[in-house]
Amino acid sequence: MHIVYNRYIHKGAPLMNTALFQQEMKNIEEYAQTLCDTLEENFKQDSIASYKRMAMTDSGYATQRLEEIENGTANLYKFVVQKGRKYLKIINQQYDDMGAYATYQYRDGSVHAFIDRETGDVYKPASWNKPAKHVRYNLLERSDRNFLFDWKNVGWAGGYLYMR
């Protein structure tokens, strides 16, 4: 009796058809953008709290920055999604307005996280090009999404991505 070994190995999740797979990938991309929006809100709220503490010492700079944030004219950090072959890369962008060579536009700062395009797994970055080994969260799990999409739970600096 001849048995094809690979045919009977359990490979985890059952195979899904192409339409369902493409819909899941689209959902993951939307979730990644929502995570970026949440990180931007976290940075905004963190900046407001920081400048309010500074303003207590009668700092004109802090008061000016608070007004810019309230008016929507402040150049706060942005988080953008860059699509790769296997991963979505969430990149922190900073406004370049310092020094003699200032470009006065947003430039890439650092990688905040990697998201697997097929599974929705969220990884801490190991470098600019690759994620760390262990999965931190999964965007397809409702409980993880509820946690990640609350600006009070995530940190713009990535502290929530350390092993828990």
Write out the residue ranges for each language-model feature.
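Negatively charged, low-complexity tracts enriched in Asp/Glu with abundant Ser/Thr
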Residues: 12-80
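C-terminal partner/receptor-binding element of secreted or periplasmic proteins
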Residues: 144-164
